[in-house]
Amino acid sequence: MEYSYIPSAALYNNADIFQFFPRNKRLNSHQKSRLDEHARKMAAFMMERQEEYRYYENLANQEQFSDDNGMESGFCSGATSTGQSASTSPAPVQLIPNPFFDPEYVAAKTQSPVKLVTNPFFNPELVEEIKKKSQKRNEKSAPVSA
């Protein structure tokens, strides 16, 4: 059994399994498609885990908040037990600064203009000839307006 062949049902039912592709050879088209599919499914799997984590984190915060209110006011609202307040939108994701980003380097680096290489197969006379032919066809096929 090759390392690159793992049944897809086994991949996503068990999150501990990852596909392995050796880095010392080129991938064929089948391996590339399997790797793309695997990457998409693992990304979806990770997003599901993040949503699940946020849900339980919000639920824990709401239970803590409702417990604090219940102690102060003498009663506890049933909002968390019925799941009404658990449907709030998740908090925005906080970005982590990139430690390798150097704004001074980016500002100092100037982009030099790219020199285009002339196409050795470009024939301007042939282009003109094709344009003339297409204009003649368009003139013939265009309806005469009165």
UniProtKB/Swiss-Prot annotation:
Chain positions covered by the region annotation Disordered: 67-93
Low complexity bias (residue ranges): 77-92
Top-rank taxon: Eukaryota
Protein known as: Uncharacterized protein ZK673.5
